[in-house]
Amino acid sequence: MAEPGSQGHTVGPLLLLLLLLLPRALPEGPLLFVALVFRHGDRAPLASYPTDPHKEAASTLWPRGLGQLTKEGIRQQLELGRFLRRRYKAFLSPEYKREEVYIRSTDFDRTLESAQANLAGLFPEAAPGSPETDWKPIPVHTVPVSEDKLLRFPMRSCPRYHELLRESTEAADYQEALEGWTDFLTRLGNFTGLSLVGEPLRRAWKVLDTLICQRAHGLDLPSWASPDVLRTLSQISALDIRAHVGPPRAAEKAQLTGGILLDAILSNFSRTQRLGLPLKMVMYSAHDSTLLALQGALGLYDGNTPPYAACMAFEFRGSSREPEEEDGENVTVSLIYRNDTSRPPLPLRVPGCPAPCPLGRFQQLTAPARPPAHGAPCHGSYEPASPPATVPLLAGAVAVLAVLSLGLGLLAWRPRCLRALGGTV
């Protein structure tokens, strides 16, 4: 019998059963594979607005042009690369090896340059300042923006995605929030010279982007751009992002956006393991929208925009437990998010799974957000699923195996054919 006052420490049969049924975190084993998705570094504003007091001096303030990577952005990516070198020093070879690391970027100057700066920190021999005899340039792969469905997504070209977005923006809670900001957007339109009421919220976001970039570079903001105004603009931006990656129909949106990248990451790992390839790391240099869509697909969007050089890591590890336990799962997935250089990276947990998460459970939980095998509907037909986004090294290995299989098949077929024709074996 329990002593008085000790009832709170008694575990009943039902509670014990619930505890046993809860997903359990597995001990982390050796690192097998890493996928990194990071935002480009600090850049110039993407645009200006009619009454921008710094508009006339733009060519002086941003000598490389609007939207281009700044010196601070280069420094941020160099520092991120050095952080990655420290974290994965024991996992990666000291020098770049093409069979171990693959880098993909969107086809924008700022992301291509960010990838190069990052690699200069990760592999110092890739730094332009290295002695000429030691300098080893590292390839960064890309595809035209119009063809990029891995890191840019079919947002503008996909009718089905626009149907889903329209459903979100016509929802009662969205319209109610928007109505509450009508007076604010009217005043902001008067201040900026832009028409903002009844227009896509991205136009208001561009004002916020310009102000944030200018403030970060020590420029004076207009008197109307108070902290309260910037805070309200951030809230409007968060509403717009939720409409793009959140409910309703968040899973179907993800199948056309971040779920494509998530599926490619899982496919790259599984093929690497199945084929016994030496590939260890895949790096994606992209945008805040890429990370936001990926967070949406994982159910991890928290209302905040990823800062410059923010990085999400998918770390696949072998479990140290016996593979015959439970469902035979012996691989775990850990999600790491680095969004602040002054603090250690944050461990993330996919809803419904402990950290680290068993790979099978991770695949099960994220399946609704990933494109089905036949692809996700877009133009009345189907967008292809992940195979086109697979790292070419893996695709090449599959092709080689296919050729070998075909060759072996022909060798096996030839004697039977010759026998049928009465020829010699």
UniProtKB/Swiss-Prot annotation:
Cytoplasmic topological segments: 414-425
Query: Is Hydrolase one of the keywords?
Result: yes
Q: Name one GO biological process term.
A: negative regulation of neuron projection development
**UniProt similarity note:** Belongs to the histidine acid phosphatase family.
Q: Which cysteines are joined by disulfide bonds?
A: 158-378, 213-311, 353-357
The Gene Ontology CC terms held by the record are: membrane
Q: Which residues form the signal peptide?
A: 1-27
User: So where does this one cross the membrane?
Assistant: 393-413
Reactions accelerated catalytically: a phosphate monoester + H2O = an alcohol + phosphate
**Location of the protein in the cell:** Membrane
> What does the record give as the active site?
40, 288
Subunit and partners = Homodimer.
Q: Which GO terms describe its molecular function?
A: acid phosphatase activity; protein tyrosine phosphatase activity; receptor tyrosine kinase binding
UniProt topology in membrane: Single-pass membrane protein
Tell me which species this is from: Mus musculus (Mouse)
Instruction: Extract the Pfam families matched here.
Output: His_Phos_2 (PF00328)
Job of this protein = May dephosphorylate receptor tyrosine-protein kinase ERBB4 and inhibits its ligand-induced proteolytic cleavage. May play a role in odontogenesis.
Keywords associated with the record: Disulfide bond, Glycoprotein, Hydrolase, Membrane, Signal, Transmembrane, Transmembrane helix
Q: Report what the Swiss-Prot or TrEMBL entry states about this protein's PTMs.
A: Glycosylated.
What taxonomic lineage is listed for the species of origin?
Answer: Eukaryota, Metazoa, Chordata, Craniata, Vertebrata
Q: Which residues lie on this side of the membrane: Extracellular?
A: 28-392
In the Enzyme Commission scheme, what number(s) does this protein have?
Answer: 3.1.3.2
What name appears for this protein in its UniProt entry? Testicular acid phosphatase
